[in-house]
Curated annotation (Swiss-Prot):
Chain sites annotated for binding L-citrulline: Y85, N121, R125, S173, E258, Y270
Native organism taxonomy: Bacteria, Bacillati, Bacillota, Bacilli, Lactobacillales
Family the UniProt entry places it in: Belongs to the argininosuccinate synthase family. Type 1 subfamily.
PROSITE patterns: ARGININOSUCCIN_SYN_1 (PS00564), ARGININOSUCCIN_SYN_2 (PS00565)
Top enzyme category: ligase
GO annotations of cellular component type: cytoplasm
Protein name in UniProt: Argininosuccinate synthase
Catalyzed reactions: L-citrulline + L-aspartate + ATP = 2-(N(omega)-L-arginino)succinate + AMP + diphosphate + H(+)
This protein's UniProt keywords: Amino-acid biosynthesis, Arginine biosynthesis, ATP-binding, Cytoplasm, Ligase, Nucleotide-binding
Pfam families: Arginosuc_syn_C, Arginosuc_synth
Source species: Streptococcus gordonii (strain Challis / ATCC 35105 / BCRC 15272 / CH1 / DL1 / V288)
Annotated binding of ATP, by residue: A9, Y10, S11, G12, G13, L14, D15, T16, S17, G115
Compartments where located: Cytoplasm
Length: 399
């Protein structure tokens, strides 16, 4: 009997490796791993999928697409979920889902499987994205169905010849892409515990960072980072280089108790050295170039966009509309930001732009001042007129 095909989002870890064996009972498994800049041994992952029973194994480099179509939205949208989390994992899920659906269409598969548990956000992100792209596709979540303990899963793996990962004893659950690294579980589950140094990988402890700062110039064109210290680079490469440079100076550590979509609170440790640096730089160029009303309104859009992406609604019309609005604001965001990296901080210390709305002759308090201070008298009268009228009415009522 010919089996149906299932497309499995494969990471090379224990959960998705066991899933191949488990799914093989009813399906021919096509394993797909997306390279979003996590730095894993992709050849090993490719071969491991075949070794444990997949009929096909695909490793797809999507770093550039991820950076240009997803990360750039987060950068230009200053998307911090709950004002702290730069949407590391949440950004990669819609792209991974899109690629899984494309491969399902190419291979004739009618089912997609993922390795998410039943208490995390990612199950929602994957399944809502897949349903948004092709409602006819069926989704299987083996880990959610098993409800096995870790010990039961290991026993199943041993009984079925699934290699046990060397890092299985690690207490942490880690997800990483070029925008950052997310870490949870183990000692981190108690929010009173300070995260130990072994919970970090991309950054040095700020107190152990170099005693001298380093400065980096970041060039932007239409809101897109295009160069570091004058060197033109693809966005993905630029982010990865900043991850290394800013990480050496302890930049980008985030300790966050967040409200998950599924209704629980979770303590997460994030490392986002490149993201934190770029977000600071981009914001400063916007501060130079956006008119006041837009600068004041845009954060409202940013907050709503952050929530939509975090909650797995990338392909929702509301998200698409907000992204379109966001893009319309970026044509004037051109210039250079100089960022000082020093012991855990990324501080913009200088900025310039040909589109700058900063007029030094208006801002200065020297003799070069061109601001007409006499105009302030009439402006204040008109601006304060509603408040004055209100006060007069209240005073009349109080008599």
């Amino acid at each position: 009997m010919v089996k149906e095909k299932v497309i499995l989002a494969y990471s090379g870890g224990l959960d998705t490796s066991v899933a191949i064996t488990w799914l093989n009972k009813d399906y021919d498994v096509i394993a797909v791993c997306m390279d979003v800049g996590e730095g894993n041994d992709l050849d090993f992952i490719h071969d491991k999928a075949l070794k444990v029973g997949a009929i096909e194994s695909h490793v797809i480099d999507v770093k550039d697409e991820f950076a240009e179509d997803y990360v750039l939205v987060a950068l230009q949208g200053h998307t911090f979920y709950e004002q702290k989390y730069p949407l590391v994992s949440a950004l990669s899920r819609p792209l991974i889902s899109k690629k899984l659906v494309e491969i399902a269409h190419k291979t004739g598969a009618t089912t997609i499987a993922h390795g998410c548990t039943g208490k995390g956000n990612d199950q929602v992100r994957f399944e809502v994205a897949i349903a948004s792209l092709d409602p006819s596709l069926k989704v299987i979540a083996p880990v959610r169905e098993w409800k096995w303990s870790r010990e039961e899963e290991i026993n199943y793996a041993k009984a079925n010849g699934v290699p046990i990962p060397a890092d299985l004893d690690s207490p942490y659950s880690v997800d990483q892409n070029l925008w950052g690294r997310a870490n949870e579980c183990g000692v981190l589950e108690n929010p009173w515990n300070e995260a130990p140094e072994d919970a970090y990988d991309l950054t040095v402890a700020p107190e152990a960072a170099p005693d001298s700062p380093v400065y980096v110039n970041i060039d932007f064109e239409a809101g897109v980072p295009v160069a570091l210290d004058g060197k033109k680079m693809k966005l993905a490469d630029l982010i990865l280089e900043l991850n290394d440079l800013a990480g050496q100076h302890g930049v980008g550590r985030i300790d966050h108790v967040e409200n998950r979509l599924v209704g629980i609170k979770s303590r997460e440790i994030y490392e986002c050295p490149g993201a934190v640096t770029l977000l600071a730089a981009h914001k400063e160029i916007e501060d130079l170039t956006l008119v006041r009303e837009l600068a004041h309104f845009k954060p409202i859009i940013e907050n709503e966009l952050s929530n939509l992406i975090y909650n797995g609604l990338w392909f929702n019309p509301a998200t698409e509309a907000l992204i379109a609005y966001l893009k319309s604001t970026q044509q004037v965001v051109n210039g250079t930001a100089k960022v000082k990296l020093y012991k855990g901080s990324a501080t913009v210390v200088a900025r310039k732009s040909d589109n700058s709305l900063y007029d030094e002759s208006l801002a200065t308090y020297t003799s070069a001042d061109t601001f007409d201070q006499d105009a302030a008298i009439g402006f204040i009268k008109l601006w304060g007129l509603p408040s004055k009228v209100h006060a007069e009415v209240q005073a009349h009522k109080d008599k």
